[in-house]
Amino acid sequence: MCIRDSSNVGYLFSPMRFRVRGYNSQYSDTYINGVLFNDVETGRFSYGMIGGLNDATRNKEGIGAFEVNNFTFGPIGGATNINMRASQYAAGSKLSLSGCNRNYILRGMYTYSTGLLKNGWAFTGSLGYRWANEGVIEGTFYNAFSYFLAAEKVFNDKHSLSFATWGAPTERGQQGASTEEAYYLANSHYYNPNWGYQNGEKRNSRVVRSFEPSAIASWDFDINKEMKLKTSAGFK
């Protein structure tokens, strides 16, 4: 099973706690332009840092465990490399508006890319917003903005420099686990013990606020037809 397919299964069947090859997520690595972005404390990649940037993160390569590739030695859980070089995005613009009845109810995204211009420059930008005054679970809310900006200069057939920065400031109310007895008394399996009324207004006691602004710079050097040097430095 390829990483792309298993990622889809992991998202769609997350309540079943799907795991690639049975390994925990810290055994799967996620790279961006060749730089490992797994958290140094948990060992896991935080998908919240690229939340709402679907168009900006579409260019990716996925590998299985120990599979031959050009960006890592290959961990036992597989790896993914997201390519955020501006010249790799198709020229044009895209606007999308969607609704759902899960964590958020409304999502808007806009992406624009120049493609590779005649002067060797390429620019790509993306903005996104996800919102819910209250999700399908009572007492939850969702307020998230996301941005992405990339620029690249292709000097010739051998050298190019690129820069990308992105972030997704998010604030959301969490749902909490409960017991079958509580669900029975509430007459609903959507019962959420994390919320209540304070001064006549709904208040969630578990609010998550996250923001990991990130940036990465890359230099690509095609030494010859059989050898390439890719150097990247990033931070978050």
PLM segments and residue spans:
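Transmembrane beta-barrel wall of Gram-negative outer-membrane proteins
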Residues: G99-A132, V136-Q175, V207, P213-I223
